[in-house]
Amino acid sequence: MPEKELDYIRSTDAAGSTEKDGGIYIDAFDKQDNAPPKKGFAKFIDGFRRADAEELGIDPNLSEAEKIAIMTANSPLTRSLKNRHLQMIAIGGSIGTGLFVGSGSSLHTGGPAGLLIAYILIGTMIYCTVMSLGELAVTFPVSGAFVTYNSRFIDPSWGFAMAWNYAMQWLVVLPLELVAAAMTVKYWDAKTNSAAFVVIFYVLIVAINFFGVRGYGEAEFIFSAVKVLAVLGFIILGIVLCAGGGPQGGYIGGKNWYIEGAPFPNGAKGVITVFVNAAFAFAGTELCGLAAAETENPRKSLPKACKQVFWRITLFYVICLTLVGLLVPWNDERLLGSSSADASASPFVISIRNAGIKGLPSVMNVVIMIAVLSVGNSSVYGSSRTLAALAASNQAPKIFGYIDKQGRPLVGIIAQLLVGLLCFLAASDKQGEVFNWLLALSGLSSIFTWGSINVCLIRFRRALAAQGRDTGELVFTSQVGVIGAIWGAFLNTVVLCLQFWIAVWPLHSSPSAEAFFSAYLTVPVVIVFYVGHKLWTKNWQVYICAKDIDIDTGRRELDLDLVKQEVAEEKAYIASLPFYRRVYNAWC
């Protein structure tokens, strides 16, 4: 049965209605623009003008939260991301230096078994989180997505803290990644000043985002395709090398699991350290949910994208890291590289060099450089959309809500690019100290974001039950349900607690204030945002009661009876398919 795409109410009758079913009252959809279309340079200049602010016939009796939900649901952001963009962002978006390089230090710290255990556990948490995000984002494909869900389902102050936490995470990531990209070039050219390459990569990121969400989508499609092909190629090569098929021959098998110290060289504390590192390696997984508001058909595309996460975790992380643990000894000194972008510290590169294969290490360094640029590109997208959502929610200066006629949150993009100029500190003698603190500022941001997404799903389901509704009105539900959301929230809490332990008593070093704040700075920053908002608004309510949560405003599917009928028909259609088709539909 072909899926149908329902849309927002688009009639003047609905706009004038005082009914609150859905809470969306749009007054200007039928407005006609009789002006002749602009061409050439005039069209180019006109594209930077603010998008026409639609007159939203908002019921003045609505609460502030409901008004905000309406505004975020009707953002001028363009819905031009296609299914292929979202699928590739989901499957390859967060494959970066955390896998290609960071897994090296994790192998050295936790050993081959510790590495595998940590990534599998964190992988289950990520899968549950993305499933929770998918259910919410398909139901409420609004500007800012999970950035705004916290204010709706948990508490406005927590939403404020989480939104600014997420915006800051991406704001500081751009200069870090630009410098990291320039450092990858040192693999071939150690003489040229890094600042020269920083300029080149900075201009590239500016050019990509000049083309709006479509530019971001196409760039990520290419970047992710390269990363996926590289990982698949390594898996094939790794199996051949383990079996003794490399140029130097010799069966490797599992011997590196039995060398001195393996498979747990640093015991439980080493595994816990890897546990935290593994969480950082998955950062950016949630971006497919943020892109829901700019996707042509989120009802069809987003569930497929969420299901792809299972394959990314299984294929790209678990299988790859199993091979890494087999091919590279945990005590190889090269694993302790000087930076997160040092290709010589990549276990992928080390395994290729150990096999005596020439040329491929350089190819792998290109992949690492592309992975770094991909994260930098995503940082502009993530921060600008978050700032726009904050402005629409009255939680940031209104200027950040400026969205031009091409659907670009222009002021947010400019703000991110200005912060990106910090990358030129690469020429400073204090660059290491500055970037370490920038990294500390964003270190635990993803943990807070993922934990909050799971709590939002739990609160949403509670609100449905409290208001006499059920999941029969949802076009997509999490495959792991509330139990999965509880597991995801629990594991994120565990990571925060374990990181506190590592921050107070670091592995192989003495406790110090500097070590603590470099590992745990995000937590006091979040507390300051949360308490500050409480003091400013004088709203002392800890959480929104389930019966008071708005579960209608911002929905794309407003005719709930029709939705229930379509969901029932779709389930019946799937049940009639052959077994292999049902399995494929469940996992793909």
Curated annotation (Swiss-Prot):
Disulfide bonds: none annotated. The keyword DNA damage does not apply. Induction: Expression is under control of the CSY1 amino-acid sensor. Induced during biofilm development. Expression is repressed by nitrogen sources. Expression is repressed by the antifungal agents ketoconazole and flucytosine. Expression is also regulated by NRG1 and TUP1. GO terms for molecular function: amino acid transmembrane transporter activity. Its main location: membrane. GO terms for biological process: amino acid transmembrane transport. It holds the Pfam family AA_permease. It is a multi-pass membrane protein. Glycans are attached at residue 61. InterPro entries: AA-permease/SLC12A_dom (IPR004841), Amino_acid_permease_CS (IPR004840), Amino_acid_permease_fungi (IPR004762), APC_YAT (IPR050524). Keywords: Amino-acid transport, Cell membrane, Glycoprotein, Membrane, Transmembrane, Transmembrane helix, Transport. The chain crosses the membrane at residues 88-108, 113-133, 160-180, 193-213, 221-241, 271-291, 309-329, 366-388, 409-429, 438-458, 482-502, 512-532. It is found in: Cell membrane. The keyword Membrane applies. Disruption phenotype: Leads to a growth defect on medium containing phenylalanine, valine, leucine, or methionine as sole nitrogen source. GO terms for cellular component: membrane; plasma membrane. NCBIfam families: 2A0310. Amino-acid permease with broad substrate specificity. GAP2 is the only amino-acid permease with very broad substrate specificity, none of the other GAP permeases is able to transport such a variety of amino acids. GAP2 is also able to transport thialysine, and thus probably also lysine. Functions as a sensor via detection of some amino acids including methionine, leading to a rapid activation of trehalase, a downstream target of PKA. Belongs to the amino acid-polyamine-organocation (APC) superfamily. YAT (TC 2.A.3.10) family. This is General amino-acid permease GAP2. It comes from Candida albicans (strain SC5314 / ATCC MYA-2876). The lineage of its organism: Eukaryota, Fungi, Dikarya, Ascomycota, Saccharomycotina. The gene is GAP2.
